[in-house]
């Protein structure tokens, strides 16, 4: 009986990935995002990543594999996940949770940097606020979204959307694949 559940879960994950692959624009946007990131690094820029919940963990994972390593040894790339607990608790307390990413970007973000956002709904107010600050500062925006892109649709320089309207975990599974592909492409572009 559990084998049927396991198989159904894996088949659903496959279906979501196939729907993502069916849209050629998604593949082009991954290439565009990798170029944007590599160009930023080559010009002394950095990437600042953010997300909420599981997407927050993915934002940290992305930054960690850029500053640490992915598969092979190579120079570290400048990446910061906006995840400092003292910053989040201070800004959350003093300004509200909707300001946690925007406030960090105000202090640390510079023209030529890239804001890398993850939101399965595309409606996270704290990320929308960060995008607004990024645009005002000349910071490029890459957004990994799901469903119909939500309020983030059309706001990013590059949006990579997983067109799934079910549970968020299926969207996150594709997001982590995108993250790994981006790192692989960045390494090739930086070599």
UniProtKB/Swiss-Prot annotation:
Cited PROSITE patterns:
SIS (PS51464)
Q: Does the keyword Cytoplasm apply?
A: yes
The entry's family comment says: Belongs to the SIS family. GmhA subfamily.
GO CC, sorted alphabetically, is: cytoplasm
Q: Which residues bind substrate?
A: 52-54, 65, 93-94, 119-121, 124, 172
Q: Sorted alphabetically, which InterPro entries does this protein's record hold?
A: GmhA/DiaA, Phosphoheptose_Isoase, SIS_dom, SIS_dom_sf, SIS_GmhA/DiaA_subfam
Classification via Pfam families? SIS_2
Give the quaternary structure.
Homotetramer.
Output this protein's name.
Phosphoheptose isomerase
Q: What is its EC number?
A: 5.3.1.28
Q: From the Swiss-Prot or TrEMBL record, state where the protein is found.
A: Cytoplasm
* Gene Ontology MF terms in the entry: carbohydrate derivative binding; D-sedoheptulose 7-phosphate isomerase activity; zinc ion binding
Q: PANTHER family this protein is in? A: PHOSPHOHEPTOSE ISOMERASE, SEDOHEPTULOSE 7-PHOSPHATE ISOMERASE / DNAA INITIATOR-ASSOCIATING FACTOR FOR REPLICATION INITIATION
The answer to keyword Zinc applying to this record is: yes
Q: Describe which pathway this protein belongs to, using the record's wording.
A: Carbohydrate biosynthesis; D-glycero-D-manno-heptose 7-phosphate biosynthesis; D-glycero-alpha-D-manno-heptose 7-phosphate and D-glycero-beta-D-manno-heptose 7-phosphate from sedoheptulose 7-phosphate: step 1/1
Please list the residue ranges annotated as the SIS domain: 37-191
Biological source species: Psychromonas ingrahamii (strain DSM 17664 / CCUG 51855 / 37)
């Amino acid at each position: 009986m559990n084998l049927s559940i396991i198989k159904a879960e894996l088949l659903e994950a496959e279906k979501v990935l196939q729907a993502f692959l069916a849209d050629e624009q998604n593949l082009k946007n991954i290439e565009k995002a990798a170029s944007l990131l590599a160009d930023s690094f080559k010009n002394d820029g950095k990437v600042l990543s953010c997300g909420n919940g599981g997407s927050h963990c993915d934002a940290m994972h992305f930054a960690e594999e850029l500053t640490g390593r992915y598969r092979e040894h190579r120079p570290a790339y400048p990446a910061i996940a906006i995840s400092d607990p003292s910053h989040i608790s201070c800004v959350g307390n003093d300004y509200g949770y909707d300001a946690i990413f925007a406030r960090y970007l105000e202090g640390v973000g510079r023209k030529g940097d890239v804001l890398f956002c993850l939101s399965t709904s595309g409606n996270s107010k704290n990320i929308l606020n960060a995008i607004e600050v990024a645009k005002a500062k000349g910071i490029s925006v890459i957004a990994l979204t799901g469903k119909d892109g939500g309020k983030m649709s059309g706001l990013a320089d590059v949006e990579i959307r997983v067109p799934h309207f079910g549970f968020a975990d299926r969207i996150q599974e594709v997001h982590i694949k995108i993250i790994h592909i981006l790192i692989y492409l960045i390494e090739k572009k930086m070599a």
